[in-house]
């Protein structure tokens, strides 16, 4: 039992966090600077191809859609939360992605994104099929 507690403490100290139940994650409203539509511009090392596009849609209430497209669209809903004072997107797949502001861009899962007026047509179609629980920006 003592070894298990020590192992758990080491994981927390190492920055490895895990979400056991998505439904238990406390949603945090988005700061004004984050609510809206974000998209990669140009090639990104974190994406599978130079032609791939990464998008993040964030509502004021803190609901999110992580949308990545290349030969197909992968759209995963989630919600913002604070983990150790860091703004983090937790997806329904229980993946954790820290969101950091850098001037007029954000850093998200190894990608640099800039604000755009609307999502791509493919991400908008994904939203039509599975709308977020709160109104879009």
Swiss-Prot record:
Range of residues in the leader sequence: 1-15
Keyword set, alphabetical order: Cell membrane, Lipoprotein, Membrane, Palmitate, Signal
Location within or outside the cell: Cell membrane
Keyword Lipoprotein: yes
Lipid attachment points (S-diacylglycerol cysteine): 16
GO cellular component: plasma membrane
The protein's name: Uncharacterized lipoprotein YedD
Species this protein is from: Escherichia coli (strain K12)
Lineage, uppermost ranks: Bacteria, Pseudomonadati, Pseudomonadota, Gammaproteobacteria, Enterobacterales
Gene that produces this protein: yedD
